């Protein structure tokens, strides 16, 4: 197989969110397969020396906090999977149903807290920052649990459940209302057989900008949509400068994020995967640590004996 070729930022900025790589890059993301190491001692040697650490996180790290992933067997809301509802077409066809789905997800987060994995990442960022070392999190998650745990250097490439975007004026705003609008109160039950609320569009969340009143949508990246070029430029810079990369709780099947860690590995930077199972990318990385992230990450990111702690 051909080695992975670094995908230039001008290409990455044009990529869209999806479950398969764009045709133009499918032949660029293959690496020679090798068995990854599970030696924590060896990983810790790299960790002790790293000055710029990138952590790429996915749904697995939040699943340990009880956040529904809508992936795999049982990953349904009513009779739909996320990819059935998280699309521009679904919103255009039935905005009430899509808003019920996202209202349910927002309300669920009210009872969820960061787990040991989130906390280990945030603590590591704070500790290493005092040593002049950089830790940045690139997350595909939209639940804000990294932020809640205290992570500051955070790139939320798929947006946030708690931001809205007006379909008329384009204004993006934080929104932590519960419920987000009166008509959604008590709606969004996930059980199969639950009937759609069929809320009139004028009663769905509306823009509060003066003179607008347009329909709001969740400020998240839906399947088939382009990712924000500005955020992806930041991602590209972080990947280009990191000297250690961790891939945490991600299935490595959603693009373009699935390309990020292989890009880094292609230039010889050690990459460590932390997951409850192997993924299509496992053999492209130097390390693989199998198990719950809340168990493996605290050990991996703990203060090293060679660190100078102020």
Curated annotation (Swiss-Prot):
**Where are the active-site residues found?**
158
Q: Could you point out where the transit peptide sits in the sequence?
A: 1-36
Q: Which Pfam families match?
A: SIR2
BP GO annotations: mitochondrion organization; negative regulation of cardiac muscle cell apoptotic process; negative regulation of reactive oxygen species metabolic process; peptidyl-lysine demalonylation; peptidyl-lysine desuccinylation; protein deacetylation; protein deglutarylation; protein demalonylation
Positions contributing to substrate binding = 102, 105
Location of this chain's protein in the cell: Mitochondrion matrix; Mitochondrion intermembrane space; Cytoplasm, Cytosol; Nucleus
Q: What else is known?
A: The mechanism of demalonylation and desuccinylation involves the presence of a 1',2'-cyclic intermediate, suggesting that sirtuins use the ADP-ribose-peptidylamidate mechanism to remove acyl groups from substrate lysine residues.
Q: Which family does it belong to?
A: Belongs to the sirtuin family. Class III subfamily.
Q: Summarize the subunit comment.
A: Interacts with CPS1. Interacts with PCCA. Monomer. Homodimer. Forms homodimers upon suramin binding.
Name of the molecule in the record:
NAD-dependent protein deacylase sirtuin-5, mitochondrial
- Lineage of the organism: Eukaryota, Metazoa, Chordata, Craniata, Vertebrata
């Amino acid at each position: 197989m051909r080695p992975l070729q670094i995908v230039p930022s001008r290409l990455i900025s044009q990529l869209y969110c999806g479950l398969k790589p764009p045709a133009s890059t499918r032949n660029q993301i293959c690496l020679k397969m090798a068995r990854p190491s599970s030696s924590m001692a060896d990983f810790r040697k790299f960790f002790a020396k790293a000055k710029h650490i990138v952590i790429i996180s996915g749904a697995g790290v939040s699943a340990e906090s009880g956040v529904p992933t809508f992936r795999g067997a049982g990953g349904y809301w009513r009779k739909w999977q996320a990819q059935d509802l998280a699309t521009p077409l679904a919103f255009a066809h039935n905005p009430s149903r899509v808003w019920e789905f996202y209202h349910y997800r927002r309300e669920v987060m009210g009872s969820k807290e960061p787990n040991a994995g989130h906390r280990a990442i945030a603590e590591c960022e704070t500790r290493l920052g005092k040593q002049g070392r950089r830790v940045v999190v690139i997350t595909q998650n939209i639940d804000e649990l990294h932020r809640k745990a205290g992570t500051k250097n955070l790139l939320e490439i798929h947006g946030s459940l708690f931001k809205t975007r007006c379909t008329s004026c384009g204004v993006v705003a934080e929104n932590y209302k519960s419920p987000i609008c009166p008509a959604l109160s008590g709606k969004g039950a996930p059980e199969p057989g639950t009937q759609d609320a069929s809320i009139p569009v004028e009663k769905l969340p509306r823009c509060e900008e003066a003179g607008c009143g347009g329909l709001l949508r969740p400020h998240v990246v839906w399947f088939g949509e382009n990712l924000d070029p500005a955020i992806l430029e930041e991602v590209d810079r972080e990947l280009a400068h990191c000297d250690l990369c961790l891939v945490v709780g991600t299935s490595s099947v959603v693009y373009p994020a699935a390309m990020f860690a292989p890009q880094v590995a292609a230039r010889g930077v050690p990459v460590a995967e932390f997951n409850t199972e192997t993924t299509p990318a496992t053999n492209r990385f130097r390390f693989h640590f199998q198990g719950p992230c809340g168990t493996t990450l605290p050990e991996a990111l703990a203060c090293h004996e060679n660190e100078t702690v102020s």
